Structure formats: C-alpha cells, structure tokens
Amino acid sequence: MGNPQTTIAYSLHHPRASLTSALPDAAQVVHVFESGTRAVLTRGRARQDRLPRGGVVIQHTPIGLLVIIDCRAEFCAYRFIGRASTQRLERWWDAHMYAYPFDSWVSSSHGESVRSATAGILTVVWTPDTIYITATIYGTAPEAARGCDNAPLDVRPTTPPAPVSPTAGEFPANTTDLLVEVLREIQISPTLDDADPTPGT
C-alpha cells in the first residue's frame, strides 16, 4: 500500500465495560473511559489532544464497522467499510489485538462529515487499563475496490507543515483542530466527488 498518509490514534484510559468486551462474539461493545488522548498525524504535521471522560462504541453492522468516540464537547464517529459485508475484526489470538482492513471510510465530527474512497487498516488493542484504537489511512485506493469510482484521496495541507515538538507532543490549545482540518480538506478536495455535504447545508 505504500506509506500511510494519515494516522488517527486514540488511547482511552481506565475503560469500564458497559455491555460486553468480547469483540469477536458481540455485535456491539460499549465502554466508558476516564480520560484519553487523540493523536493525528498527516503529511509532516502532528497534533495530540487530551480527551475528558467519555464513551466509546464499537459495532459490527452490515454496512461496515462503526467506531464512535463521544466526550460531549469532543465527538467523532467513523464507519470503516470492508471488502465484504460479512467481514469482521480479525483477531491475533495470542494477544488482545484486532485488525479490520477497509477499502473506504466515512467520518463525522462536530460540523464536518466526509466520505473517502481510500483504503487502510483499523486496529484495536486491549490492555488491562487502556484501549488503543488506530486508523491508518493510505493515500491511494486499492485496485480491488468496488463501488468507488472516485480518484484516490490526496490530503494536502493548506499551510506549510508545522514542526512536531520533540518533547511536548502537543500544539497550543488555540491551534486549529488537525482532525477537523483533515476532514475539511477531504470534504473540499477536487479529486473526491462523493464527499458528503456539511450537515445542515
């Protein structure tokens, strides 16, 4: 697939299961977490934000794998669309680790909604005190993708790449949210014709 173009990584600390934690045997998993972080890396830029207490939903559906992170003020929902409607998270049985390759994905946050015909892989790692959810998105659509007639996504920053702090790992609080910026760039990308309009427009 080549080098990843965008990585979105969540670390959710001190999770407590509201329903079930057996991903392969359940259609839905609901957890509450006490705190967390969200990191976004794209084309030389990086940002990490702290997340307050919130909830996470991971759900198998006929239209893909849903991941919802809801911290009230911070909200983002993702739908990762696999190559078959029966595709499930694949588990490496010697570890609490799951993988879900996808051919396209949909994401919605506060004020932004977008669909992208680009492939990648979602991984979910469970530890006793943290859930790690990472979406690695590549800049070219797979040759075997079906139902996607659009050109590959090429996410380009509208401003020169900013250097990543080697110590803090976070940008100032007043910096524009990089995830929202990435979603907005995908939405207005002239190479992607099927971007969803912003809700309410």
Curated annotation (Swiss-Prot):
User: Is the keyword Cytoplasm assigned to this protein?
Assistant: no
Q: What is its main location?
A: host cell
Recorded superkingdom: Viruses
- Compartments (UniProt record): Host nucleus
The protein's matches in InterPro entries, at most eight in alphabetical order, are given as: Herpes_UL4
**What cellular-component terms does GO give this entry?**
host cell nucleus
Q: Does the keyword Transit peptide apply?
A: no
Keywords from the UniProt entry: Host nucleus
The chain's disulfide connectivity reads none
Q: Provide the family line.
A: Belongs to the alphaherpesvirinae HHV-1 UL4 family.
What is the name of the protein in this document? Answer: Nuclear protein UL4
